[in-house]
Design a protein with these regions (language model features):
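Bacterial N-terminal signal peptides that target proteins for export
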Residues: 1-11
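N-terminal secretory/targeting leader peptides
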Residues: 24-133, 148-370
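C-terminal motif of bacterial Sec signal peptides marking the signal peptidase cleavage site
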Residues: 18-22
Length: 370
């Protein structure tokens, strides 16, 4: 019944999306202003974990805020604050929880010290791809679990974007075996960082705004961030030359929209539906943007900045997969919420993998002539 109610609201709001966003331009803005003048105007603050105007992630938050305003006819306006403007990047969750901001935009693995199970809702090493993750969230019980673990913090989560499969990271030396990870200080948050710890590396959790300086000054020896589109914008090629793939640690990283529970529930039903549709549209649009932008950015990195593109050895990936499986089992055993989420995640992963082995993987191999 809950799903039917949500779907009916989404359908109504989707019609508003088409009529309002399709207009665009100054005429659309005038309509928004007129509607706002005739209705109560609600003003929200959105805190983010991203640098100001950062491509894909930061701009994704800004676009989401603009669409909420347009779709609501100016009744709900959201002002976006980049990391550090209102609160530090890694304090965005707390700001939304206590009501300092009504909305947040970040990644759930940043709050692992507060909510260990939250890490599963950004990404899991060797886990679900972006599309598989969305399917688990909307049709496999993932969203309900996500909402449940945030209840004690008065926060409502929603998936608000995904850059897709990431790169394996930037290094100043070749990585040929597990021995090369020994003592390596690498920026890698979430479960991937715990896997690194198991193989002898030193994981460091840094927000995006601090990565370049840390890598350039030697505070860290290596880093992963997102992929070519974002990594080029950050200038990471100036601090390291070896660029490894695949991104075993982040096969699809969900970006998270956070809502203060009291603020969200105070909205009328139609505004709640508008917000949900806007977030769901942002979730898909980010993947579209990154998929369209990554390859040209990668060519720029390799051809213009002499970045050395390297593939992790197969035996190294197998060892990391083994360490990842052990890490996930240990995490689940230590925390009841993590156990519940992991069980659901693993069940869905096993099921969808069976299908993708004969569909996605088989097709990609055929397309490549293999």
């Amino acid at each position: 019944m809950r799903n039917l109610m949500v779907l009916s609201k989404l359908a109504l709001a989707a019609l508003l999306t088409v009529s309002l966003i399709a207009c665009g331009g100054s005429e659309s803005d005038k309509k928004v202003a007129t509607a706002a003048a005739n209705a109560e105007v609600i003003n929200w603050k959105m805190v983010t974990t991203w640098p100001k105007n950062y491509p894909g992630l930061g701009t994704g938050a800004q676009t989401l805020a603009k669409n909420i305003s347009k779709m609501s006819g100016g009744r709900l306006n959201v002002k976006v604050y980049a990391a550090g403007e209102l609160v530090p990047a890694l304090e965005a969750f707390d700001a939304v929880s206590r009501g300092t901001a009504e909305m947040g935009h970040g990644a759930s693995y940043y709050w692992k010290g507060k909510v260990p199970a939250a890490q599963f809702f950004t990404t899991v090493p060797f886990g679900l791809t972006s599309q598989e993750f969305n399917s688990w969230i909307y049709y496999g019980g993932g969203l309900q679990l996500w909402e449940e673990i945030y209840v004690p913090f008065n926060v409502i989560p929603m998936p608000a974007g995904n850059p897709g499969v990431q790169m394996g990271g930037w290094f100043n030396k070749e990585i040929n075996s597990l021995e090369d990870f020994q003592g390596l200080k690498m920026r890698m948050p979430g479960i991937g960082g715990e896997v690194l710890k198991k193989v002898g590396a030193v994981p460091v959790n840094l927000p995006g705004s601090e990565i370049f300086t840390a890598l350039q000054t030697g505070t860290i020896d290596a880093t992963e961030w997102v992929g070519p589109y974002n990594d080029l914008a950050f200038g990471l090629y100036k601090a390291a030359k070896y660029y490894y793939y695949p991104g075993w640690q982040e096969p699809g990283s969900a970006i998270e929209a956070l809502f203060n529970k009291a603020a969200f529930e105070a909205l009328s039903e139609d505004l709640q539906a508008i917000v949900r549709v806007a977030v769901q549209q942002a979730n898909q649009d980010m993947l579209n943007e990154f998929t369209a932008s990554n390859n040209s950015a990668l060519k720029t990195l390799v051809n213009e900045h002499n970045v050395i593109l390297k593939e992790f050895p197969k035996d190294l990936l197998a060892a990391l997969k083994k360490a990842s499986d052990e890490t996930l089992a240990e995490m689940a055993a230590e925390d009841p919420d993590s156990q519940r989420v992991y069980d659901s995640f693993k069940t869905f992963l096993d099921s969808v993998s069976e299908w993708h082995d004969i569909s996605e993987r088989s097709y990609i191999n055929a397309r490549a002539g293999e």
